Amino acid sequence: MGSEMCIRDSTGAGYKENLKTLPGGEANVDDLIAGFIQAIKGDSSAMKMNPQQAQQYLQTYFVEAQAREAKKTKEEGDKFLAENKTKEGVITTESGLQYKVEKEGTGAKPTATDKVKVHYTGTLLDGTKFDSSVDRGEPAEFGVGQVIKGWTEGLQIMPVGSKYIFWIPAELAYGERGAGQDIKPNSVLKFEVELLDIVKE
């Protein structure tokens, strides 16, 4: 395989993966490719926008597409929580945090100023795992009051030695901003948490 073909194939594959990440899933890939070709060749005869107009259009498109996706994620999350709270063993707190006791420990409950040692696995509602101390093979330690609101509230419910499942509404997690590549705006998060100890300092 020649170097030109390698460049072509690797570049094409890269563009393909990037196009998959476009919010809203509404972009016409053929139109985008045609636009790339015109731009690369310097052919402006078929272009209906100048560069400034095109930039503004793309910015507006992305903002609107992200807003639509965030709305969809919120609607899906609200529907899930409404159904989940009716399931056996699921408890909903005043804030909207939902949890289920898998194992009830007999130790002390931490306060908001304590530091704790936990094992946890975090997933999205579709099962996508975004973080896990279990997979890393090492418990995490952090302050109860130094994490997302759902964690701060949930940890104070748990006696040491407990295993709980938490479903955390977006407003008690990362809200409208999301976090990283996996946690989209308005995402409900599921955490399986084992409270191992309250760390004495």
Where are these regions (language model features)?
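Intrinsically disordered, low-complexity boundary segments flanking structured domains
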Residues: 18-22, 84-90, 128-130
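Long amphipathic N-terminal alpha/beta scaffold segment
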Residues: 62-105, 110
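Non-catalytic extracellular/periplasmic "stalk"
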Residues: 9-79
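Short, small-residue-biased leader/transition segments that mark boundaries at the very start
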Residues: 1-6
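A generic alpha-helix structural signal
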Residues: 58, 81, 152-155
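Core FKBP-type peptidyl-prolyl cis-trans isomerase
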Residues: 90-200
